[in-house]
Amino acid sequence: MPNANEPRFPTHVAIIVDGNRRWAKQRMLPVSMGHKAGFDRLREITRYAVGDRGVFVLSLYVFSTENFSRDAKEVGYLMDLFANNFRTIADEMNERGCKVLFSGRREGLQQRVLDAMDYMMDLTKDNEKGIVNFCLNYGSHAELTDAIRAIAAEVKAGTLEPEAIDEKVIEKHLYRDLPPVDLMIRTSGEERLSNFLLWQCAYAEFYFTDTLFPDFTKECFDKALAEYARRDRRMGGNTKK
C-alpha cells in the first residue's frame, strides 16, 4: 500500500460524494437516512485520509450550487447535518493538527451553517499538518465566474494590468489557492465531474467506483490510492510522475 512518503502518493485528493439517495432507496429508507449514513462515512474517511494516511489536501464535494433545486425538505435536512456536525468535525481535525477550509458561495446558505463554517475555519486556521476543503454551495462555473469578476475589478481599479494576467493570477483568485488535484474519486458509478474543480483537475487521475458513498470504507479509499500509484502520469509530457 502506498504511503505519504512515496513519490506516487497524491498530495491532493478530491471526492465527489455521491450515492446517498440511492443507498437509502435500495434499503427502502427515507432519503434523510441516506444522507445521515453518508455524513457518518464522510467523517470517517476524512479522519482516515488526512489524519491517518497522510493525504495533505482532501477536497469534498458535499453540496453543489445546483443542489438547491432539490426538494426543500431534503435541502433543509442537509443544512441541519452541516450545522449540527461541522463543529464536531472541527474538533476532530484540530486534534489532528489539520486545517479546515470552505470553497463555495456564502450567499444562500443559512446563518447557522455559516456560523458553523466560520467556527471550523477559525479554530483550525493555524494548523499545518493537512487541509480538509469542504466544497459547499460550490460550482466550478461559479468559481471561475467569481474569479473573473474579481480580476476585472482589479483591472478597472488600475491595480492590475491586463498583460499581467496569467494562470497564476487566475489561480490566486479561485476560492482557495490549493495544489492541483492529483486524484479525483467519484462514488456511485457515475463517470462525470459534475462541475467540480474543473480548473484544478486539469491533470488529475480519475477513479470511478460503483460503491455508493455510505458504503465507501477505508479499504475502498486504500484501493483508490493503490490504483493511483499504478498510473503512469506524464502531465502532458514524456516524464513519468
Locate predicted features:
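Flexible, compositionally biased loop and terminal segments
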Residues: 1-241
